[in-house]
Amino acid sequence: MMRARVPLLLLGILFLASLSASFATSLREEEESQDNPFYFNSDNSWNTLFKNQYGHIRVLQRFDQQSKRLQNLEDYRLVEFRSKPETLLLPQQADAELLLVVRSGSAILVLVKPDDRREYFFLTQGDNPIFSDNQKIPAGTIFYLVNPDPKEDLRIIQLAMPVNNPQIHEFFLSSTEAQQSYLQEFSKHILEASFNSKFEEINRVLFEEEGQQEEGQQEGVIVNIDSEQIEELSKHAKSSSRKSHSKQDNTIGNEFGNLTERTDNSLNVLISSIEMKEGALFVPHYYSKAIVILVVNEGEAHVELVGPKGNKETLEFESYRAELSKDDVFVIPAAYPVAIKATSNVNFTGFGINANNNNRNLLAGKTDNVISSIGRALDGKDVLGLTFSGSGEEVMKLINKQSGSYFVDGHHHQQEQQKGSHQQEQQKGRKGAFVY
């Protein structure tokens, strides 16, 4: 009898150990999320809205649900659209302003206007992925998207700004297996009077009975499209595409990386594209007003953000660090200093909220360095000396040791790094920002 109990006891111990390990892992992941509320891991932060053999639509979880510290982003959502070659995203409208960036492939965007007009735009990644007017979709505008390329997939990142509430609603005219047409929700007599037709005809032409749709309608909101239709759409799109807006872009770059920015004043949004070579460092900097949402398109990077510790009012600073990879998202609050080091060739798409009258302030580097500007303001080498432990002359000498700007060589000596880390540990717990 005793022998029979031993295996059962061992099984019980193993079960409890497994349960404990699982709980510990879950708790650790939750703590990591709480410790860094600005980091959205691609593995568990994207929710799929629709998926079939031709592509998918997915949305990043709401920013304010990740952390109360991101509640100023509650009216913004990030959406990703991917589609296979020669496909069509069926006509729809959304209760949100949309900004589109093509991150791979090419697209034909068609906007349907109420005065019997259509606007066609041909968008490619090669068009420096910065928004212009033709990549902005006003709320409530019916639009559809085509991937005209016979070989390459299409990937679009869009920033959505709801006009009703934090939830976004996409209204599709089509009736498919994935969803029904919103027109079907109107009563029979409303439809008959509106179309001046019998309901049976309306149902047959617009909706079809379940199981009677044509094959193309059963595939969902992303469907295949034949080459003849693509060719016709391409003619209109190419003739209607606007000229390049490159002169309006603010581009900064060197051998280590490039930054291109543009502000859409009508939407108060900054749009940026960042490309960095492996080993490059985007020196510490901050944005004066804009809250920047970074999306990793390709590659990997290490990011360090400095901000107040925890959710409570505190005078202590904390470093929020993350290892970023493809499809990860990182939020940079206004006035929070940040540095990015490329651990491989990497590129980002960035959206800056509250961008009007925003300034980017660098804390290191040869040009646009606000610390060195303190010395020029008020004839202020003495001010620098009062600000830091060294004299103003020593501070300027230290700053001038870095001959690069914005993007610099991120490699450094390990011994120096270890020494600096020890000194940083000694300084932890000291007061940082005033909170009021």
Curated annotation (Swiss-Prot):
Q: Which residues form the Cupin type-1 domain?
A: 245-396
One of the record's GO molecular function terms? nutrient reservoir activity
**CDD domains per UniProt:** cupin_7S_vicilin-like_N (cd02244)
Which intervals carry biased composition (Basic residues)?
Answer: 236-245
The record's listing under SMART domains reads: Cupin_1
Cellular localisation: Vacuole, Aleurone grain; Vacuole
Q: Which InterPro entries match?
A: Cupin_1, RmlC-like_jellyroll, RmlC_Cupin_sf, Seed_Storage-Functional
Please report a single Pfam family linked to this protein.
Answer: Cupin_1
Q: Give the family per the record.
A: Belongs to the 7S seed storage protein family.
By what name is this protein known?
Phaseolin, alpha-type
Which organism is the protein's source? Answer: Phaseolus vulgaris (Kidney bean)
- What is this organism's lineage? Eukaryota, Viridiplantae, Streptophyta, Embryophyta, Tracheophyta
